[in-house]
Amino acid sequence: VSSPASAAVSSPGVAPGRQAAQALAALLAQSGTDRAAITQAFNAVAGCSTGLSQDQAIFSNAASSRQTLLGELAALPDRSALPASMLQDLTAAWQASGQADQDFAKWTQDEISQGCSTNDQSDASYQAATAPDDQATKDKKAFAALWAAIADEYGLPLYQYNQI
């Protein structure tokens, strides 16, 4: 099974920077799909919607997906052709997001088992998620600022921090 990143490997005549950027764009697209589901799950749990077990699964699956993305990012073809600081920002962002996703899954379980309270920010698992979530946002903003120039150079999609 090939990943989106490996699908861009070694096209003859394609500059390494373009190849790496295309592979990274594929990972960002994959991450964006997860991000939309996470946002919906967060809003559902905060509002005590029905289906909290499904929302918990979304958070757990997202944490797992972030680990997969991190592995693919580490194996990105021609990654040395991209700015190291940009890759470090994205790595840190996905690591922090993965931790936040795990904590949000625990928060959801707490809401299920203890009775859901709308916008319950006093839960220990919710509070544990805020620091890595804040760090992820900071790192995503730094990444997105650097990605914009790469995307522009190679005609690739732009990503705002809240789409990563």
What are these regions (language model features)?
Residues 1-9:
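Hydrophobic single-pass membrane-targeting/anchoring helices
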Residues 8-17:
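Eukaryotic intrinsically disordered, low-complexity linkers and tails enriched in Pro/Ser/Thr/Gln/Gly
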Residues 19-108, 118-164:
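Alpha-helical segments in soluble extracytoplasmic regions
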Residues 112-115:
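A glycine-biased, small/acidic residue-tolerant capping/turn segment at secondary-structure junctions
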